[in-house]
Each structure stands twice: as C-alpha cells, then as structure tokens.
A protein has these predicted regions:
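SIR2/sirtuin-family catalytic core signature
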Residues: 38-43, 61-66, 76-83, 114-316
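Short beta-strand/turn micro-motifs composed of small residues
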Residues: 47, 91, 160
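A short, charged helix-loop
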Residues: 92-113
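Class I SAM-dependent methyltransferase SAM-binding "motif I" and its flanking Rossmann-like core
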Residues: 81, 85-92
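Active-site metal-binding loops of divalent metal-dependent hydrolases
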Residues: 50, 92, 131
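A conditional alpha-helix N-cap/helix-loop micro-motif detector
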Residues: 23-27, 106-110, 135
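Phosphate-binding loop that captures ATP/GTP phosphates
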Residues: 71-72
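Metabolite-binding pocket within alpha/beta catalytic cores that recognizes anionic/polar moieties
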Residues: 2-65, 99-102
Length: 317
C-alpha cells in the first residue's frame, strides 16, 4: 500500500526496490544454505524476495550455477528432474519493471508459476522461512495443497520466530495435517543448525578467502553487525574462518618476502621476525598495534634492507 501510494509507475517502484537492495552483503546463513545445496540436500527455491542475494550466494560459494526464473513465460522450461539448482521468483525480480510490489499486484500469481509451485509440491516437501503469509495468491495455493492427499506428502515446515504476528489464514493453516510450525531464532541461525545437524565439518570456503569478493563478504560476517556471535554454531565457524584468514595473511606475507630473494636473504633474523609479528597483527585487524610496532621497529632497526620493508607496512596501514 505504501509503495503504491508513493510510486504510481511500475518503473518508479522498481527503482525504489533496487535502491533498497543495492549494496547488500551476504550473511552467513547464505553460506550454510549454499553448502547444503552443494552437498545435495536442497535444490529448489521459491522466493518472494526481489533482490539477487540468493543468486549472488551461488556465485560466491558454489561452482553450481542456478536456473533463475523471474518471468511467468520462462518457468515452463524448468524440469523437476533437473539436477541444477533452481530459483523461482514468485513476484518477479527488481531488475524488471513488472515486479509485484503492491498489495493488488501480489493478490494474483501468474498461472505458469502457480502450476510449477504445485508440481514441485507434489514431489517434495516445503520449508517456509522469512515469509509472513500475507500474499493471498500464494496462501491460496498452499491452502489448496494441504487439502490434497497426494501433495506435500513430505510435510510443510513453517519457520516462525518468537513474537511473530500470525495472521488468521496462517493460523488456520498451521492446524492442518502435515503442517509443522518450527520456532527459529532467525534465517542465519536456522541454516546454521540445519547444516550442523546434517553436514559434518565447517563451510569449506576458506580456500577462497583470497578472492576479494569473498574476503569482503567474510569480513562483513566477522563484523557481527547482526549480533550472530551469540549463536554457538555460528561463533565457532566465524572463529575458525578468522583463524584461517589470519593464517592466509601470514602465509601471503611470508610468500611476498620470500619471493624477493635479495630482500629475504639479506634481512637480519630479528627484523624478519619483527615483520612477521607486524603481519600477524595486521591479519588480526589490530592495525593500531601493527602501526605502533612498525614505527618502533623502524626506528630501532639498523638494516638498510629492513627499513624499506617497515615503511611498506606503514604505508599499507
């Protein structure tokens, strides 16, 4: 209602939604989700979101490339037996002007998309997370499916958070057979717990930490802007990634020094150790301590070979 009242034209609404999703970074829940796909536990996603975070997660954390459908005309070509991951946008994509962003628009679901949702629910169960059930078009389909014996035979699992407002339609739905309310702390915590229960070991993304985009994403995760460190599973994984990132930084530093034979062979052992110590503080993001140490070591060093190395560290800081 608010979007339609403020933006009359579909193109205006698209630009508004685009401005809201632009520059968003992936939270750790996406990494867990994609790893479940990589391990063969998930494959198909129906989403009401306009953003491209799910697609971006595949590009960062998987070698698999998903089939993405944001138009009614394109969804017919999706095969239920295809092994490729599938993303079907129920209300469109923000890149196109025909996104369904108003109440009137979301009251209807395109026929081909509706049929594809029904088709998949005949073969598979359904996990619903991050969705309030306020779109009549989608809820009508789900209500219909829960009344059919040969659909959702593997169950419908609806994730809720404590304190969520449950509308009357959803409340009635949760009382149906094969429909199970699941209380979760949030998107990230749910996929962390699911991953922990199904997959042994961590996320396995440390080998890509040298890639700038992944490094930026992991750095955002480690900033804990969403307060996820209180979750034991997530904290353990982020601590592990932080340790791996530190080891990679130190390894890169050693490689950089070792690659210059003239420098590495002529560095006094004390300066070599000092530079390693500075590198370790940089890896820990303790830039103040690294800077102070580099300045002190520069002033105390008597090596003409080492001094430029200290200056390079100071410049990088």
């Amino acid at each position: 209602f608010i979007i339609r009242k403020k933006y009359d034209l579909a193109s205006q609404r698209r630009r508004f939604v685009e401005s809201m999703v632009d520059g968003k970074l992936l939270s750790i829940g996406y990494a867990y989700l994609i790893d479940l796909v990589n391990k063969g536990h998930l494959s198909t996603f129906f989403t009401t979101n306009f953003d491209d975070l799910l697609q971006e997660a595949f590009y960062q954390f998987s070698a698999k490339r998903p089939i993405m459908c944001a138009h009614d005309s394109s969804v017919q070509s999706i095969s239920i037996t295809s092994t490729r991951p599938k993303i079907i946008k129920l209300h469109g994509d923000y890149l196109f002007d025909d996104i369904k962003s108003t109440l009137r628009e979301t009251e209807s679901l395109e026929q081909n998309i509706k049929e594809k949702l029904i088709q998949f629910c005949k073969e598979f169960g359904l996990i619903v997370i991050g969705y309030s059930g306020n779109d009549r078009s989608i809820m009508d389909v789900i209500e219909f499916l829960t009344k059919q014996d040969n659909y959702l035979s593997n169950g419908l699992y609806w994730c809720l958070r404590e304190g969520d407002e449950v509308n009357s339609t959803l409340e009635k739905l949760l009382w149906r057979d094969r429909v199970y309310p699941i209380f979760v702390d949030g998107f990230d915590e749910f996929f962390a717990a699911t991953h922990n229960g199904i997959v042994s070991g961590g996320l396995g993304i440390e080998s890509n930490l040298n890639q700038p985009k992944i490094k930026k994403t992991v750095g955002f995760m480690m900033s804990d802007s969403h307060g996820l460190f209180k979750d034991k599973i997530i904290k353990k994984e982020l601590d592990r990634l932080k340790s791996m990132d530190r080891q990679i930084e130190i390894s890169n530093f050693i490689t950089d020094i070792s690659s210059d034979k003239d420098v590495s062979s002529s560095l006094p052992i004390s300066d070599y150790r000092n530079l390693l110590e500075i590198g370790s503080f940089i890896a820990k993001k303790d830039f103040k301590k690294a800077k102070n140490l580099a300045e002190d070591d520069f002033n105390q060093s008597s090596s003409d070979t080492a001094k430029p190395q200290y200056l390079l560290k100071l410049i990088s800081l």
